[in-house]
């Protein structure tokens, strides 16, 4: 996209100073979980408070943090012993502007899952945004999890995309981009990207998806390394490898892995990308 004449004319002469990635929680209103649990609460992006059409969630994150803080203070002052449950946070959330805002746009993202596809979604979303404004008696559902939408390489509609080599001006190679995140993890700590069975994962995923992890990861964490010789690579000719120190915590793997056997967990030392205001 950056090489499109319009965008390249804007970006030319500039300097890339940072890089980052984060998977968007597009579930919206329909996917808000129970936000309180014994001794804690879910706030912000953890609870999925992103306004998907606007791709904005800072304001809802801040508001949910304020609501949780108020509920926490009330719970701690009223209950001096036992487990603290933030029931007041659940109630305050439903009476807040967060709930009202997300409910108003709840049908926009699911509307793209229709027989008319993109065109149908655009038409319905426009109707919702400018006329209906969420004041409808129905709530559209998401058809299924994101990972279930991944097609195998054998599917007729799947074609290989060949991208041009990065020019070092507008586009950059992956390792250069990762270096701009400032990410760092201690090499000797347990891998925080947990795979139930590495060999089984490779046997199951590589023949069907031809190294999907290589393509959806924006930091080069996952690799299928070529291995030749009898008995190597389980007959696939490749070995599944995780470069966890490169991880920038976008959580795409946890969401998109077709077999759902990759689990992102907090690194032992709490490390990760060092983002800063640019």
Regions found by a protein language model. Give the residues of each.
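Iron-sulfur cluster-binding cysteine motifs and their immediate structural context
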Residues: 207-273
């Amino acid at each position: 996209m950056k090489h499109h004449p319009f965008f390249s004319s804007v970006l030319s002469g500039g300097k890339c100073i940072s890089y980052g990635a984060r998977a968007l929680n597009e579930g919206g209103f329909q996917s808000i979980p129970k936000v309180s649990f014994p001794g804690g609460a879910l706030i912000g992006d953890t609870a999925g408070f992103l306004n998907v059409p606007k791709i904005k969630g800072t304001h809802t994150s801040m508001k949910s943090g304020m609501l949780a803080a108020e509920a926490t203070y009330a719970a701690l002052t009223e209950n001096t012993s036992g487990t603290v449950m933030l029931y007041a946070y659940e109630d305050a959330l439903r009476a807040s502007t967060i709930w009202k805002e997300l409910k108003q746009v709840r049908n926009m993202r699911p509307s793209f899952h229709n027989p008319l596809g993109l065109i149908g979604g655009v038409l319905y979303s426009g109707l919702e945004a400018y006329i209906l404004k969420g004041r409808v008696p129905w709530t559209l559902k998401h058809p299924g999890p994101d990972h279930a939408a991944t097609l195998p390489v054998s599917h007729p509609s799947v074609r290989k995309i060949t991208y041009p080599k990065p020019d070092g001006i507008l586009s950059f190679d992956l390792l250069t981009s990762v270096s701009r995140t400032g990410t760092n993890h201690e090499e000797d700590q347990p891998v925080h990207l947990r795979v139930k069975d590495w060999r089984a994962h490779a046997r199951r995923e590589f023949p069907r998806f031809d190294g999907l992890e290589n393509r959806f990861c924006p930091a080069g964490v996952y690799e299928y390394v070529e291995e030749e010789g009898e008995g190597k690579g389980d007959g696939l000719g490749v070995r599944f490898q995780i470069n966890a120190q490169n991880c920038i915590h976008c959580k795409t793997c946890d969401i998109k892995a077709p077999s759902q056997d990759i689990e992102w967990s907090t690194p032992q030392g709490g490390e990760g990308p060092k983002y800063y205001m640019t």
